[in-house]
Amino acid sequence: MPEEEQLTFEAALQKLEEVVQALEGEGLTLEDSLAYYQEGIRLVRLCRQRLKEVEGKLQVILLQDGEVVTRELSLPGGENHGT
């Protein structure tokens, strides 16, 4: 598994912030800028993947007919996972 795929969300986000700072700075060559941009895209995809994994695991516990029932949480602005 590539190193970036093992990163936690927080670590990937931190690396992404560093990439953005580097791109906003001065003195990068075109080639370096492209490399940072590509790394940033990979990190964004990884962060989205991690968020999607967590979103799929979030559940709301409801009490229906005396039984505890779970269903997936529907987040505003995101995909609806509710039943």
From Swiss-Prot:
Q: Major location, coarse class?
A: cytoplasm
Q: Which SUPFAM superfamilies match?
A: XseB-like
Which superkingdom heads the taxonomic lineage of this protein's source? Bacteria
KW Cytoplasm (keyword) present:
yes
GO-annotated molecular function: exodeoxyribonuclease VII activity
Q: Which UniProt keywords apply?
A: Cytoplasm, Exonuclease, Hydrolase, Nuclease
EC number(s) stated in the UniProt entry for this protein: 3.1.11.6
Which Pfam families does the protein's record reference? Exonuc_VII_S (PF02609)
One biological process term from GO is: DNA catabolic process
Q: Where in the cell is it found?
A: Cytoplasm
The entry's cellular-component GO terms read: cytosol; exodeoxyribonuclease VII complex
Catalytic activity, reaction form = Exonucleolytic cleavage in either 5'- to 3'- or 3'- to 5'-direction to yield nucleoside 5'-phosphates
What InterPro entries has UniProt attached to this entry?
Answer: Exonuc_VII_S, Exonuc_VII_ssu_sf
Q: Where is the signal peptide?
A: none
Q: Could you confirm whether the keyword Membrane appears in this record?
A: no
Protein family:
Belongs to the XseB family.
So what does this one do?
Bidirectionally degrades single-stranded DNA into large acid-insoluble oligonucleotides, which are then degraded further into small acid-soluble oligonucleotides.
Q: How does it assemble?
A: Heterooligomer composed of large and small subunits.
Protein name per the record: Exodeoxyribonuclease 7 small subunit
